[in-house]
Every structure is written in structure tokens, then in C-alpha cells.
């Protein structure tokens, strides 16, 4: 069932500036200022590699996890890119996202795609 207070951010753009100045900034502030009650960032494609390998991105993900932002990565992508273990060690949930994403879209859940 769709939760009108839960924002999902589908993060596919692996540019670090986009990550820091859009995805992360909005997600963190959305919880801080209570624009949304829940925020989940879905790591998809090359953003899995960026998250696993970029020290600054990893640090920011840790901070946001501690602040309540949820992170979940596409397992198929992470497996193919060889970064499943580093993502899990960071505290990121790693699951197959094809069906859940389809369900979110069919239920018209609030989703921001970057």
C-alpha cells in the first residue's frame, strides 16, 4: 500500500556533485525539516560503484543512515559490479529491486528519479 509520507529517491546518476548537492542534500533535509516522514534512497546501476568506492560518498551515506535516511541497493547491479559486500558492510540493504520498483510505480508512490 502506498504511504504518502514516504519518499523514494531512485538514484542512478553517478556524478558525485549530483549525489552531494541534490540527492543527499534533499534526502537529509527532507527528514531534518520533516518534509517527509521516511526517505529511502534506492542505489541503482553505477551509483553502486560510486557508493562502494568513493570515500567521501561512503562517509556521507554513513551520516545519513545515522540520521534516519534509508538506503537500499539493487542486488543485480551490485553483484554484476562486484560491490555487494562493501555496500552491505556500509549498512546498505541490498535486494533485488525489479519487482519492488514495479510495485511502487504501479501504486503511484512518490518517487524522485535522479
Identify the function of each model-found stretch.
Residues 2-5, 13, 32:
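Acidic, glycine/proline-rich low-complexity segments that act as flexible tails and inter-domain linkers
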Residues 20-33:
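Histidine-anchored nucleotide/phosphate-binding helix
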Residues 43-47, 86:
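Short, basic, glycine/proline-bearing loop/turn elements
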Residues 63-64, 72, 88-103, 109:
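A short aromatic-anchored loop/beta-hairpin motif
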Residues 112-114:
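Aromatic- and Gly/Pro-rich donor/ligand-binding loops
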Amino acid at each position: 500500500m502506498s504511504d504518502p509520507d514516504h519518499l523514494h529517491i531512485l538514484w542512478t546518476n553517478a556524478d558525485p556533485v549530483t549525489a552531494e548537492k541534490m540527492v543527499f542534500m534533499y534526502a537529509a533535509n527532507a527528514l531534518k525539516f520533516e518534509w517527509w516522514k521516511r526517505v529511502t534512497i534506492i542505489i541503482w546501476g553505477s551509483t553502486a560503484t560510486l557508493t562502494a568506492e568513493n570515500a567521501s560518498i561512503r562517509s556521507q551515506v554513513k551520516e545519513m543512515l545515522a540520521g534516519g535516511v534509508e538506503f537500499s541497493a539493487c542486488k543485480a547491479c551490485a553483484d554484476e559490479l562486484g560491490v555487494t559486500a562493501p555496500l552491505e558492510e556500509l549498512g546498505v540493504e541490498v535486494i533485488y529491486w525489479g519487482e519492488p520498483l514495479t510495485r511502487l510505480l504501479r501504486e503511484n508512490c512518490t518517487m524522485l528519479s535522479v
